[in-house]
Every structure is written in C-alpha cells, then in structure tokens.
Amino acid sequence: MFKSGSRHERRRKVFLGEFRHIMDSKGRIVIPSKFRKELQQGCVVTKGLDNCLQVLTKKNWLDESEKMASLPSTEKTSRQLRRALFSGAIDSKLDSAGRIQIPENLRKYSEIGINDDVTVTGSGPVIEIWSTKVWKKIQNDADKAFANINEVKG
C-alpha cells in the first residue's frame, strides 16, 4: 500500500494486491496483514458493484458518503444507489486475528457461503471481497477486454 498524490495534495491510501482466504464457520474473513494498519480505527463494509463487498477506511467512507449525499434525490437511480450503499453498510472492526465479521445479508449479496473460497483484493482506495468463483469470472472478462484494448492500441 502507498499514499497517492503530490506532497501538496491530500494523501489517499491505495490498497494493492490479491489474496486468497476462506470464510470461516462463523462468517469471518481474514484481512491481509498489509491492509490492517489502515483499518485499526475501524472500517465500513458495504455492497460493491458486481456482487463484491467493499471495505473502506472510516475516512474513505465519509468521503464516499458525502458524494452519495450530493446526488440529486429527484433521480430514481441516485436514490436506489444511496439506498443500496447505506442500507447494506455496517460498521466493523478487526478482531485480534485480523478478521472481520460479514453478516448474512452481505454474504448472500456477495454469493459467499460459510467455508467458501474468498478473494480479497486491493482496489485503490477500497478493499474488495469476492467469492473466488465470481472473481475468476470477472478476471476472465477483464483479461479479454484488456486483450482487445491491446489490439486497438496496436
């Protein structure tokens, strides 16, 4: 992980990498050790796109909350996005083993069951938690798109 931006800009944490774990019998997932320092003060877990879960630092959550709050409430899509983001969100804290608890509603959304393989990825300012089955499909689609971009670039 590193801090992005120039010395004069506000620094933002950037999470990088891909890690495999298993959801334990109590619905907990190990957060990679290189990400834990940033989550010591707690974090927020919420629904992400493509059936992943997002883990945000408290600061990044506040930034995202402000963006969501500024969306026009007169637009149906904005209201739906806000509802999905906020109603599915939970405050969380790492336990002494570096794990976070994932409640049943978020496990169902992300298609992650007890004892399932899980992929935890750094995705810039957020950490994403994926069912490894879903992650492999997403990565396969991304690899194909990347190959097409390379063909276009020549």
Specify the residue positions occupied by each region the protein language model found.
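Flexible "stalk/tail and boundary" regions
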Residues: 1-21, 25, 35-92, 96, ...
